Structure formats: structure tokens, C-alpha cells
């Protein structure tokens, strides 16, 4: 039985936190505009200063080490929107809260480094299997700080409901600790079922921690929901709660989806903890999502990812934790029925270190592909590097296929995505739309050897502005399952042609092209 959306009372809508956040932002915007009007009395002087500052900022933007799409997105408002564009840019560049968050994230990562040391024997085995793939591991070791592992089994789930069933079993079997970190938690069948298990486990003495992104406090959960969980014995934190303050600090969201159980089992993928992700509630037709479970040595990285973000989410002073007690035992053996073949490398991406780790994984797959690369993504808002890599792969004869939603969750993102269709199709990329509904999966699979499954979308927010995570697989048996699911999903899709693109709604096409100019800032 599908769950129904919870009705919101008029009182909660009017006096809820969302309303106060919006009012606070509007008041601050009104204050800035009143300053602009006052400056209008000195228009000639202000205009001369504005032209000088604008020119200086444009030169600075052009010389900054950033993607050209971001440069264009900033130059347009600086030149086109008088005064406000300049103030917006300066405002974004001097954000003390963001610097404080970056410092906490950096410190928490440093604390976990001793637990994420690459086993050179494993690295040597991968180098013997594939020198090219070992180069990606070199990058991960030196830049991102995540090792590659053997002795790890991976199980791929083609739907959220499949993942949910397995997750419930694993949670019930927990003996020592449960860590859960999600972008979205919403009350309903899925979360209520999980919460009941967490409550029971906490009562049994199992350490339970839950962390979710602060966006939830706007529409989905009460602001003081963490206190409710604390009363159940569940430690809980919100990452970066939304506040009625103009700040780019609030732009960096925790988009990750991670569960770690007893240090030996972990889940990640696209599935959040809400009913639409398991098709208990219909929003945009059938919800196609994917997830992956890993068991074994590689879970160590997911454990450290969670602890890194848990520490960074709190600005309060905290005692030093013994992270070692959360690691998988050295003598851990995979359960019967699980095979630890190939190589598994979990990884995380932070928007605060100027390294697009998630994008580099995708680009590495595209640049090394020999036969095919198949992609499922909910969004297609690409920077030049990603777009060119896809086009170049197709032009050299690689089978590049992308599955997109046919029923989008965000109309503006859909209009934006369709502006990329013609140039990609013209270069040889094949694009399909999932006719039954919405694809929320984020997968790359290539050459029957490699796959990446995680939380990372093909858009600027995921690649540049969100905290993300994923799992890279090389010659692991789960790679075949990812490709098989892609082929099954493809049978439910509509191919998109250049003729289709030419007949899209005129207004929608023009709107998409306009939005593309500022897509990196959205």
C-alpha cells in the first residue's frame, strides 16, 4: 500500500520555520535594496566606481582557476546587473562561516588519515591487473585520501525497495554500532520502520548515530527532531541547519547516503530514507533508484567518512574518539555466499577542497573506456570537461549511452538537460528517457570491468557544491549486475533523436538556454 503525504496545518505553514527563514531572507534583501536607493543620490560617482570595480572583478574571475562555465556564470551578473552583481560576488568570496566549516572538515579528515593507509600489496595487485586503473588509485591516495581494497564483497540493488529489504535485515543483525548519514529523512513507512529498529537497538546497548542534512528542517522534519531521537537513545545531528541569514555557507549540503553497521557492512547509492525512494509513495511515476552494499575491508572508508562528517557537523569542542574501535576486525571473514573478488574503492568528495573527486572518477572512466560506457543520472547539467569527454568518447567509436528521466522532479533541471541533448547526440552519444517515470540512480559502468555507484549526480551542485560519496568497482562481480540492470532499464526507455530535439517546446528550449548561462550558480 502506498503511503499518502502528511497534511500540513495552516498554523504550521504560516508559523513554521520555513516561513521565518524566507521572511528573514526577504528582510535582508530589502535592506540591501534600500542602501542601493540611497546611493542613487550620488549616481555619477557611484557609476564610475562601479565600472572600475566591475572591470577589476571580471579580470580577477578570468584569472581564477575555475571551470569556464563558472566564470561565465559570474561575469554575466557582474556586468549585467548594476551594483548588485558586484556585491553578490564580493559577498560570496568573504564567507567566514564557510571558512570555519572548511577548517572543521579539514581537521576531521586529518584525524582519520592514520586509519586510511593504502595496503601496498593490494595496490601492487591492482597495478599488475591494470596500470591505468592504478593511476586513479594513486590520485585517490594522494589527493582524496582513500585506499583501494580487496577482500570486499559488493551487492548491487537495482531498486530502492530491494535495498530497503536488505538494509532492514542488516540493521536487525547489528551488535555494536549503527551509523546513518542521509541527505533526506522523511517520516513515513520507510523511515518509521527503520526508526523502530534503531530504537530497539539503542535499548539493547548498540551505539546508534543518525545525521541528516539541515534542508530537512525546512519542510520534512521539525527543527528539534534530533532531541526527539536523543530521548530514544539515538545520537543525532543536523548538518548545517538552514537559518534566516544570507550566506553561501548554506549552499554546501551533505548529499551523501551512508549506512555503516558494525564496521563490516555499508550501504550507499541514490536512495534516501523516504517513501518515494522505495515506491511506497508515487511522485513522478515509477522511481528508479540504485544502491550498493559492501561487506569487508572497504567498509573502513565508509566508517571514516561518517566520522569525518559527524565531527565536522559539530562546532562544539569534543573529546578525542578512538576511531580504531569502529573498524572491521583484522580477522573478519566474509559471510557464506559473499565473494570478495576484484577491487573496491569507496570515496568521498568535499566542495571545500577545490578537488572535484567525484567528477575525476567519472572522467577517468570516460577517458579510459575501450568499448562502452553506460550512464544513468537524474540530471544532465555538464561543465566543459565532462561534456567534451563524453563527446570525444563517442567520436572515437565508443558506445556511450545515457538514461535520463522522462518525468522530471525539477522542471528547470529538465529544461537545462535538454539543451545538452542536440550537441551530445550530434557527436554520437545516445540518449534515452525512462518512460515509466523518474531515474534517481547515479551509475557509470564500463567495459564489463568498471562501475561507479553512489550519490553523485551529473550536475554542478553534485560535482562542485555538495558533500558526496561513491563506490568504484574494478573487476568485481557486482559490475556485471550494474550492466545487466542498465540493459533491463534501457528496454523501458524512449530513444531521443535530433528530430525530437528540434520539436521541443519553443519557450522551454529558450528558457533552458537562458538558465544554462547561470546553471553553475543555481
Can you say where each PLM-predicted feature lies in the sequence?
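Catalytic-core elements of nucleic-acid end-processing and repair enzymes
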Residues: 442
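N-terminal localization/anchoring segments of enzymes in phospholipid and broader phosphate metabolism
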Residues: 1-360, 364, 368, 392, ...
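Histidine/acidic-residue-rich catalytic or RNA/ligand-binding cores of hydrolases
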Residues: 385-387, 414-416, 446
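Thr-Gly-centered strand-to-loop micro-motif
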Residues: 376-377, 404, 434, 453-454
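Helical hairpin unit composed of two closely spaced alpha helices linked by a short loop
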Residues: 369, 379-400, 405, 410
Amino acid at each position: 500500500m502506498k503511503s499518502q503525504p502528511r497534511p500540513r496545518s495552516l498554523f504550521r505553514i504560516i508559523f513554521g520555520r520555513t516561513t521565518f527563514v524566507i521572511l528573514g531572507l526577504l528582510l535582508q534583501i530589502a535592506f540591501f535594496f534600500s542602501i542601493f536607493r540611497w546611493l542613487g543620490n550620488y549616481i555619477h560617482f557611484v557609476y564610475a566606481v562601479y565600472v572600475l570595480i566591475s572591470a577589476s572583478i571580471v579580470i580577477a574571475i578570468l584569472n581564477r582557476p575555475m571551470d569556464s562555465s563558472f566564470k561565465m556564470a559570474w561575469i554575466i551578473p557582474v556586468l549585467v546587473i548594476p551594483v548588485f552583481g558586484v556585491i553578490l560576488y564580493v559577498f560570496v568570496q568573504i564567507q567566514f562561516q564557510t571558512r570555519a566549516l572548511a577548517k572543521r572538515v579539514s581537521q576531521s579528515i586529518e584525524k582519520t588519515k592514520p586509519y586510511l593507509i593504502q595496503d601496498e600489496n593490494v595496490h601492487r595487485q591492482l597495478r599488475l591487473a591494470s596500470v591505468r586503473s592504478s593511476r586513479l588509485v594513486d590520485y585517490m591516495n594522494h589527493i582524496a585520501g582513500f585506499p583501494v581494497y580487496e577482500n570486499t564483497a559488493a551487492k548491487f540493488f537495482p531498486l530502492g525497495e530491494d535495498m530497503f529489504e536488505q538494509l532492514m535485515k542488516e540493521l536487525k543483525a547489528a551488535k555494536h554500532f549503527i551509523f546513518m548519514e542521509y541527505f533526506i529523512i522523511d517520516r513515513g513507512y520507510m523511515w518509521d520502520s527503520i526508526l523502530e529498529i534503531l530504537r530497539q537497538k539503542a535499548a539493547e546497548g548498540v551505539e546508534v548515530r543518525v545525521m541528516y542534512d539541515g534542508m530537512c528542517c525546512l519542510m520534512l522534519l521539525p527543527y528539534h527532531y534530533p532531541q526527539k531521537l536523543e530521548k530514544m537513545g539515538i545520537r543525532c545531528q543536523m548538518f548545517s541547519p538552514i537559518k534566516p541569514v544570507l550566506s553561501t555557507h548554506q549552499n554546501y549540503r551533505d548529499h551523501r547516503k551512508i549506512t555503516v553497521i558494525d564496521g563490516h557492512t555499508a550501504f550507499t547509492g541514490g536512495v534516501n530514507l523516504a517513501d518515494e525512494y522505495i515506491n511506497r509513495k508515487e511522485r513522478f511515476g515509477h522511481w528508479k533508484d540504485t544502491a550498493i552494499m559492501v561487506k569487508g575491508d572497504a567498509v573502513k572508508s565508509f566508517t571514516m567518512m561518517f566520522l569525518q562528517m559527524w565531527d565536522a557537523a559539530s562546532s562544539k569542542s569534543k573529546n578525542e574518539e578512538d576511531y580504531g574501535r569502529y573498524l572491521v576486525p583484522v580477522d573478519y571473514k566474509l559471510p557464506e555466499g559473499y565473494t570478495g573478488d576484484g577491487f573496491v574503492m569507496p570515496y568521498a568528495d568535499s566542495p571545500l577542497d577545490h578537488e572535484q573527486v567525484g567528477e575525476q572518477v567519472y572522467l577517468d572512466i570516460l577517458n579510459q573506456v575501450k568499448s562502452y560506457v553506460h550512464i544513468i543520472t537524474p540530471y544532465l547539467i555538464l561543465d566543459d570537461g565532462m561534456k567534451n569527454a563524453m563527446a570525444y568518447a563517442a567520436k572515437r567509436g565508443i558506445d556511450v549511452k545515457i538514461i535520463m528521466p522522462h518525468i522530471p522532479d525539477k522542471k528547470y533541471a529538465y529544461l537545462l538537460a535538454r539543451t545538452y541533448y542536440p550537441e551530445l547526440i550530434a557527436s554520437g552519444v545516445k540518449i534515452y528517457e525512462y518512460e515509466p517515470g523518474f531515474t534517481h540512480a547515479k551509475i557509470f559502468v564500463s567495459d564489463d570491468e568498471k562501475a561507479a555507484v553512489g550519490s553523485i549526480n551529473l550536475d554542478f551542485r553534485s560535482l562542485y557544491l555538495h558533500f558526496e560519496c561513491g563506490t568504484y568497482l574494478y573487476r568485481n562481480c557486482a559490475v556485471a549486475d550494474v550492466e545487466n540492470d542498465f540493459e533491463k532499464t534501457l528496454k523501458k526507455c524512449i530513444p531521443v533523436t535530433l528530430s525530437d530535439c528540434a520539436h521541443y517546446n519553443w519557450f522551454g528550449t529558450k528558457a533552458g538556454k537562458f538558465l544554462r548561462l547561470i546553471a553553475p550558480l543555481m
